[in-house]
Curated annotation (Swiss-Prot):
It comes from Haloarcula marismortui (strain ATCC 43049 / DSM 3752 / JCM 8966 / VKM B-1809) (Halobacterium marismortui). Its EC number is 4.2.1.10. Homodimer. The active site is at 120 (proton donor/acceptor), 146 (schiff-base intermediate with substrate). CDD domains: DHQase_I. This is 3-dehydroquinate dehydratase. One of its GO terms (biological process) is 3,4-dihydroxybenzoate biosynthetic process.
Length: 229
């Protein structure tokens, strides 16, 4: 996955959804921190869709313990041919935790995999200038800078969309979205402004973040909006 155009990922903790996801998704995001035996799942995987692996630590809203094993698992996952991208937290790459996330980024590049550098705010959305600054830092570490924040108002969504458009115009690859009810529509609208990645579960009951649409709905909405743009 090179993310040169919009890529819709089916977010899941179970690679068994691949046949159903194939209808609407361009790839899968395997949430290793939510999954049972994620490395065994990768060993058994014979699907067609490429995979982005995420092993989110508890301090960034996930369920993985902040141990060297979290990064070791990502590095092992990258040995699988189907894994063509990895998500690493901006804070980890800038020194949060006691372990070297940079080695995973290096391993990904050695294998020709893309690096998505992510940052999250589960409480609020900063102003546009702060969003741009955060995403620029993320882009400096990886191929795509990803930011998800919680919107409390339409103004928060406008700040995120404005930052997305600004950075896209500068040639950066970013993936952006606002979480929560006030920001839900951003998941469909942000690709029109340049966001390169969307995330959605096949089944809405399996959402991995607040405000996610199900996969088929998001594919339809994005397709309609992009065709009108």
């Amino acid at each position: 996955m090179d993310f040169e155009s919009f890529t819709l990922l089916a977010a899941t903790d179970d690679l068994g959804v691949e046949p159903a996801a194939r209808v609407d998704a361009d790839g899968l995001e395997l949430r290793m921190d939510f999954a049972d035996e994620p490395l065994a799942q990768l060993d058994a995987y014979d699907g067609d869709l490429p995979i982005l692996v995420t092993n989110r630590p508890t301090w960034e809203g996930g369920e993985a313990a902040d141990t060297a094993g979290r990064l070791d698992a990502l590095e092992t996952a990258l040995e699988h041919d189907a894994v063509t991208a990895v998500d690493l937290e901006l804070a980890a790459l800038e020194g949060a935790g006691d372990h070297d996330a940079g080695r995973v980024a290096d391993a990904a590049r050695d294998r020709g995999a893309s690096v998505v550098v992510s940052t999250h705010n589960f409480e609020s959305t900063p102003d546009r200038e702060a969003i741009v600054s955060r995403l620029e830092r993320a882009c400096a570490h990886g191929d795509v800078g990803k930011m998800a924040s919680t919107a409390q108002s339409p103004d928060d969504v406008l700040a995120m969309l404005g930052a997305t458009r600004e950075l896209t115009a500068e040639g950066e690859q970013v993936a952006t979205m606002c979480m929560g009810a006030a920001g839900r529509h951003s998941r469909a609208v942000a690709p029109v402004y340049g966001s390169r990645i969307g995330y959605a579960p096949v089944d809405p009951a399996d959402a991995t973040a607040p405000g996610q649409y199900d996969l088929a709905t998001l594919r339809t909405l994005v397709g309609q909006l992009q065709s009108d743009a």
